[in-house]
Structure formats: structure tokens, C-alpha cells
Amino acid sequence: MASSASSSSSPSSRPPLMALPSFYRPPWPSERGGEQRATDCWAGSPAAGGGRARATAMGIDLNNTASGGEEDAPAPGPVCRDLWHACAGPVVSLPRRGSAVVYLPQGHLSAAGAGGGIRGEVAVALPPHVACRVVDVELCADAATDEVYARLALRAEGEVFERNLHGGGIEREDDMEDGDEERKSRMLHMFCKTLTASDTSTHGGFSVPRRAAEDCFPPLDHKQLRPSQELVAKDLHGAKWRFRHIYRGQPRRHLLTTGWSSFVNKKKLVSGDAVLFLRGDDGELRLGVRRATQLKNEAIFKAFSSESSKMRTLSAVADSLKHGSVFHICYNPRATASEYVVPYWKFVKSFNHPVCIGMRFKFHFESEDVNERRSGMIAGVSEVDPIRWPGSKWRSLLVRWEDATDCNSQNRVSPWEIEIVGGSISVAHSLSASSSKRTKLCPQGNLDVPALYGNGRPDSVETEKFPRVLQGQELMGSRTHRATCSPQSIDITKSKSFDAWRFLTDTRSCMLGSSTSRLPVQYSGYTHQSVSFGESIGFPEVLQGQEISQTVPPFQGMLPDACSAKSRYELKNYVCTPATMNGLSSANEGYCLSLSTVPPSPPSSLMLYQTGVPQLELASKNNDKSGNDSQPALRQHKLLSETSWDQFKIGKASTPGNATKPGNGGREVDRTSCRLFGFSLTEKIIPTDKDGEKEVSYETDCQNPRMLDLFGYNCSTPGALHALCAAPLGI
């Protein structure tokens, strides 16, 4: 007990947690009687794994009884550069120490799964492109997955751009760590094979091509009956693997048998992965793995996965820009399709060659240890995230691949990743402004941001100088609502025009309008002209190719049902005008408003045609003596609004086709007929007055009344057409 108390009072033998019982923590070496007991206890519990731990200490592996396999890995040292590049692939290249590169924070965050920002926003204000100087390059490999990566030490330097702008020297391609020719000269004794199902089976071996075995492996003694030898190869981490190399079978072939299954199980290799052997100039054999499916690189993921680590990295970049300090990043060129550490010369070269839509390009990518090229065409130029990273060139090109393979479903590439093929493209696809004095077909402005017009829909930027020629499939509600105002001679004075415009503004609130137009009501001294024939305000417009898409902006407002009876509408030449309205003085009443004097264009066979051009007049108070006349006019207004509002044509003040019959009680009778497919829609209509008496709206002494053939019957009833037109609306 005394010894126990003395040992407990010693601060060097016990941690501060003295209140915990002994079964909550492993016993310390002083309690077990030595350092060996502590090692056995940490390796496994005495009941379940103590024997296994002691067997492991003796060099016996109970999980692998086959001879050969992995030896004890030494302390981690530098990775072989040739083996690192062989595992990385032929396309990957690293910058030299002291060379200039461009660091892209947006690409770095995207590779880490942050989508170009931290929690939806960029926490640290950084430019999209950071020019840096490479201080150090450390080649690394993940111990769990054998994925290669590099740890770069960079220092931000703004003088690199300044020297380039002032005509200084620019780093060239030889500033990379090693070129393809230099790498191939050092890797003459190397082969890479994609594993098959038999190579990854439990009891099988690894079949080596004959030429590869003779080039990389030491020669066999073929004088023996069964030639064989033992091979020792080092992996990326310096661990040694032992294999038995034999030459047998019918036909004879080279096989790696003993130790191969242990290697496959340890590395978790599957069919489709690649294994490569490399023999250096010193004769030492090295072994590497290149997986078909990229596994998560734990070393990089832990270093740049949490929000705090990302904040520290971005803050270090900001400090380097401000104070010139060194910051470190882990760079895995195989983890992302677009690099975020680009050589400076390649970055500047992409800026010197402008990119246009429609250009063809070649793209380098890796496939089964070969450097293949794919062709494509540039379909668009836009920033991935213009809000958080404005002006970024990272993955700014939208591409369309020409072959079936779309390069891992990658529809965006960076300008420095492609090689432009040819320079001739269509003028309509060019993004750069032409220097010609002729009218440019390419609009000026940002083509990537849609423009919102008055109709409330996004629309592409289009020049206003060229009239559109429609083919019949466009709707009037898309872009034709933007009426073109041309200065013309106005028939009335400026003051009268202002009052007329006020009347037009008040009238728009009660007339049937289009829900697609949201143009603000503003006064303008110009008149609106409509080149198309009498078409509906709310219906699609079908042009034949010769009309110019300049239409009157539609009236917007309430439906006809929303108009109260107190307004007392009158029908005059197919236009309803309120007898009394707000905003129009009595002195100005009775004036005529002429908004269009352009004659209609030739009609279409599919549209309604109006023989006369109606007018829009301001009714005076003298014409509104009683409210009895408003009921037939309102009924006729409902009839005409159901059949077609296409007959509204804001035209001249007087039309020869309109006349007033004195024998009808002062009511104006319009002889202009509205026809649908050749049949009259307005003749022989007998409206009913309020007092029950029937009165003919048109000439009752018509010598040749028209007979309307409906559904195969000759109908002579004057009200048949009225009943047919009014039936859908319940009139």
C-alpha cells in the first residue's frame, strides 16, 4: 500500500486523471512490470487479441499464411519522382521550383466539394486569379488509397502581371518540371497492364506480357526445367513486396504467383485497375497502382474538408497577397477535370487567343494510359458563378462534343485546357465586336445575362435596328409587344395630343387587354403605327414573312365584366368609347384621335379581314342624352368582342364606309361588314330594346339579304347568327 501511495503521489508516473478507476484506462507500464506489457496491452486485449499481438511481434501474420508479401514499411521518405508521374498519368505535369503559376481559388473550393464558396458565399475576398511563384514542390501519396498528390508551397506575386503588361519576359513551357520527351527517356523500362478478372481472383496469378517481362524483370535461367525467380519491388511508400516469377504453361507465359494475392487484397484492387512496374537506371524494381475509379484522397480531404480548414487556406492566400508570405495547398491533378493550379504561360496564352462561339477545338484527356484527343465545338462563354467570382475564367466555356463520348459528361472546360483548331467561324457566332462600319450583327453587351423586357419574360439581347421577319410560329406576346415609335406628323396640336393620351390611358383600364404586356404607361409625342392588318389584341399574330413586327402595344386592364354600367359604353365603328370619363375636360371632348394612318397590309387567308378601317373618336356629351341606347350597343359590343377583337384598327378620323342614317332615331348604322370565311357576322342582327320593341340595326329594306348556310341548312332567320355567336358566352 505504501508503494502504491508513493507511486500515486509521483506526478511523472501518473496523469492528472487520478479519480478514474483502473478499468476505465489501460494499465501503465509501472503497473504491468515493463514496457513490453504495455505494448502487448495496446496491441490487443489479453482475452481476445493478446496472443495475436504476440504473434505479430514474432513476425507471424495469422491472416496471411502464404509466403512472400509485404515487408515492414520503413519510415516515410521522399516518393520516387518517376513512379509518381507514372501513377499520375501522362497528362499530369508539375511546375518547377521558382516558376510562375496562377492559382484559382474557385477551382480549389470546387474540388473540395464547396461549390466555389463556403456556405454559399465567399468568406474571404480574393481575386479569381492569383499569380504566384512556386517555392517548393513535395510529391506525396495517400497511404490508404495510393492516390498521388503534390503539396505546393506558393507565394503570391503581383509583379508577374506587371512585368507581362510592360513587355517583360514570360515563362515558357520549359518551366515545367519535366517534359514528355524527358519523361519517356527515363521510363523506357516500364509497363502498365489493366487487371482482368483472372488477375484479381483469389487463387490466380498475374499474367505478364512476354515483352514486358523481358524488358522490366531480370532475365530467367531457361536452362532450368521450371525457370523461376523471386522479385522484390517497392511501392510509393517504400514498402517492399515479394513475388515469385515463373515461366510455365501451355503455351508458356510469365506469371507472378506467390505474394500476388496478398498484394491484391492489401491494395483492394478490382478488375479495371491498372498495375505498373518500373525499373530505373539503378536496376531497382518499383511497383505502382492507378485505379480506374478515383477514391477519396483522405490526405487532401482531411486537409481541406472542414470549414475551418478552408477558411485557414483562403486566409493564408489573402495574407500572401498582402504581405508576401508563403501558403501551402495540396494539389491532386487527377481529382478534378479542370486544374486549379495553371502554369502562367498557359494562362496568358489562352488570353491572347480570343475564343468565339462556333470554334472547333481539341481536348486532351487520359484514357487507359494513352493520351487521347477529342474534338468539340464551343457552344457558349459564361462564368460559372458571376456573383461570387466575377470575371473568373475557370470553366468558362460551354462545349458540345462531336463524338458519342462526352469526356465524363463534362460540358464546361477552361480556355487553357483546349487547343483551337482553325480560326474561321461564322460572323453570327462571333462574340467579339467587328471593326467594320457596317451594322454589326453581333449585339454589344453581356450575352450571358438575359434581358427582361416589358412582357415579363427573359429574352436574349437583340438589336433594335433590324426588323424581325416572323415565319408564323412566334406569338405576339413574346417580343412583338415592344411597339416601335417613329416620329411622324401629328394631326392635332401638342395640347390635344396630351389630352388624347390621357384619354387613352384611362380607356386602357376598362378595355380588354393582354396579360402578357407590362409596359409602363408614359406619355409620348410620337404616334404608334401598326403595319399589320386588323388583328386581335390578345390573340397570336401570324405573319407571312413580309411584315415588320411593329404592333400597337395592347391595352391592359380589367375584363369587360369588370366595367360597370355607370360608364355607359357606346359602339361606334366597332370601338367602345365611354360617354363620360375621368381625366378629360369638357373643352377637349369631341376631338378625334388619330393614332395610325398606315394602310393595312394584304390579309392572310387564316385571319379576319375588315374592309373598312374603323376610327377612334372622342364622344361628346351631346351624344349621350339618354341611357337607353347603351343597352343595344353593349349587347352588340359583347357580340363583337366574342367573335373577334381583331377588327380594332386605330385609323383615320373619317372613313367612307361609315354613314349615319337619319331614319333610325339618330343611331349610327355602320355598313361596313365584318366577315368570317366569307360570311357576314353583322348583317341582319335584330337587337332588342329595353322596352321590348325590336329595332333593325341596319337597313331593313335590303334588297338582297344574305342567307347563311349553317351545318348544311339554308337559314333565313336574321337572328340565327346572333344566337350562334352568343351561345358560348351565354348571352
From Swiss-Prot:
Disulfide bonds: none annotated. GO terms for molecular function: DNA binding. SUPFAM superfamilies: DNA-binding pseudobarrel domain. Expressed in roots, culms, leaves and young panicles. Its main location: nucleus. Residues 1-22 have a biased composition (Low complexity). GO terms for cellular component: nucleus. SMART domains: B3. Homo and heterodimers. Auxin response factors (ARFs) are transcriptional factors that bind specifically to the DNA sequence 5'-TGTCTC-3' found in the auxin-responsive promoter elements (AuxREs). This is Auxin response factor 3. The gene is ARF3.
